């Protein structure tokens, strides 16, 4: 895609009908090459949002983004545990804690994340307060994954082309297709995902997009309490991609042998508070936060093929925590990536 490409005709098309895959890949290629003005970027993103993004558009945009990202080599069977963000719920860092629990159970986790979007403290914010340098290079992330079975990949480090669209996104201040693309642009190109969505209407379209992109097994989930993860308070809607087939169903904490907790019990705070809660969880603290993480880890272990059902997955997750293996993964990752330049983020 030439940097001189004029995307204005594509903006006009996007406002009236879905773009074809070729058109969408051209449009997003222009965005990522810096060939569009902020007004043009905003026009394209909002035209698509108002009309509703299609699977073909999401797959094409993901391909354009993947083609320009700084990749790492991930081992066979590696997975990502991530949410779209944008649920506005301000919970504790559930997917981050889940990543350490799943890694402690022996599944390689290549976690892709960023700073706060829907919570008061995003995964990167909490990890920084836990003493990890989240801005480590792709080479360090790859080495950490190989050595410890877990890594954290900061989105801006691995997606430098996003610098061209970041200011326009910030000015828009609303959800765009990029909230959907983030979980599908893992730099390790993992083929197994537990992905939370900010609205359950996106569960199936995102599952269809991941199928188009070659994922082997994925759960797209949205909690009944509005969270972009599996809820410990309400039933959760799931779109499962497995062996090329997509099925939709609901699950509840009871399916994993876990109690239901009030949503308020998993509300988070600032990065320091959330980091302290995560460390306490890995040290064996009981309660709603632990149960929420065990529930999400149970699903991740099922997706990874390490558990036959949610109850078995929950048992494996508890063992990962209580044996100290999950906590050891945090320590091992910290040793690999070093401390942040500014521990206060």
UniProtKB/Swiss-Prot annotation:
- Keywords of this protein's UniProt record, alphabetized? Amino-acid biosynthesis, Aromatic amino acid biosynthesis, Glycosyltransferase, Magnesium, Metal-binding, Transferase, Tryptophan biosynthesis
Task: Provide one Gene Ontology biological process annotation.
Answer: L-tryptophan biosynthetic process
EC numbers:
2.4.2.18
Q: Which GO terms describe its cellular component?
A: cytosol
**Cross-referenced InterPro entries, in alphabetical order?**
Anthranilate_Pribosyl_Tfrase, Glycosyl_Trfase_fam3, Glycosyl_Trfase_fam3_N_dom, Glycosyl_Trfase_fam3_N_dom_sf, Nuc_phospho_transferase
Residues that bind anthranilate 1: 83, 114
Q: In which pathway does it act?
A: Amino-acid biosynthesis; L-tryptophan biosynthesis; L-tryptophan from chorismate: step 2/5
Residues annotated to bind Mg(2+) 2: 228-229
Q: Which cysteine pairs are covalently linked by disulfides here? A: none
Top-level EC class, please?
A: transferase
The UniProt entry's coiled-coil ranges are none
Give binding positions for anthranilate 2.
169
Per its UniProt record, what SUPFAM superfamilies does this chain match? Nucleoside phosphorylase/phosphoribosyltransferase catalytic domain, Nucleoside phosphorylase/phosphoribosyltransferase N-terminal domain
User: What does the record give as the reaction this protein catalyses?
Assistant: N-(5-phospho-beta-D-ribosyl)anthranilate + diphosphate = 5-phospho-alpha-D-ribose 1-diphosphate + anthranilate
Cofactor(s) the record lists: Mg(2+)
What NCBIfam families is this protein classified in? trpD
Q: HAMAP family, alphabetically?
A: TrpD (MF_00211)
Subunit annotation: Homodimer.
UniProt record similarity statement: Belongs to the anthranilate phosphoribosyltransferase family.
The entry's protein name is Anthranilate phosphoribosyltransferase
């Amino acid at each position: 895609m030439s940097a001189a490409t004029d995307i204005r005709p594509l903006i006009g098309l996007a406002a009236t009908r879905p773009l074809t895959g070729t058109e969408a890949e051209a449009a997003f290629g222009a965005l990522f090459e810096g060939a569009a003005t902020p007004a043009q970027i905003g026009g394209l993103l909002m035209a698509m949002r108002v009309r509703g993004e299609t699977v073909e558009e999401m797959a094409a945009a993901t391909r354009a983004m993947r083609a320009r990202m700084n990749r790492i080599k991930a081992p066979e069977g590696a997975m990502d545990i991530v949410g779209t963000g944008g649920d506005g719920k301000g919970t504790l860092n559930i997917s981050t804690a889940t990543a350490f629990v799943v890694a402690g159970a022996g599944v390689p986790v290549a976690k892709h994340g960023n700073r706060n979007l829907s919570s008061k403290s995003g995964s990167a914010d909490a990890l920084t307060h836990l003493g990890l340098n989240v801005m480590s290079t792709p080479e360090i992330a790859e080495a950490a994954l190989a050595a410890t079975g877990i890594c954290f990949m900061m989105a801006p480090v691995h997606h430098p082309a996003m610098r061209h669209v970041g200011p326009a996104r910030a000015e828009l201040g609303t959800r765009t297709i990029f909230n959907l693309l983030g979980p599908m642009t893992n730099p390790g190109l993992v083929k197994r995902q537990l992905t939370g969505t900010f609205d359950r209407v996106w569960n199936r379209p995102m599952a269809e997009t991941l199928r188009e992109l070659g994922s082997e097994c994925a759960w797209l989930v949205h909690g009944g309490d509005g969270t972009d993860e599996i809820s410990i308070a309400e039933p959760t809607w799931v779109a499962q991609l497995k062996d090329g087939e997509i099925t939709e169903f609901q699950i509840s904490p009871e399916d994993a042998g876990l109690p239901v907790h009030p949503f308020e019990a998993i509300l988070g705070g600032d990065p320091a508070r959330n980091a302290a809660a995560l460390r306490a969880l890995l040290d064996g603290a009981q309660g709603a936060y632990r149960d929420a993480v065990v529930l999400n880890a149970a699903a991740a272990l099922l997706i990874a093929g390490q558990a036959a059902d949610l109850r078995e997955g929950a048992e494996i997750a508890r063992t990962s925590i209580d044996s100290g293996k999950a906590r050891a993964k945090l320590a091992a990752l910290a040793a690999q990536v070093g401390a942040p330049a500014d521990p206060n983020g």
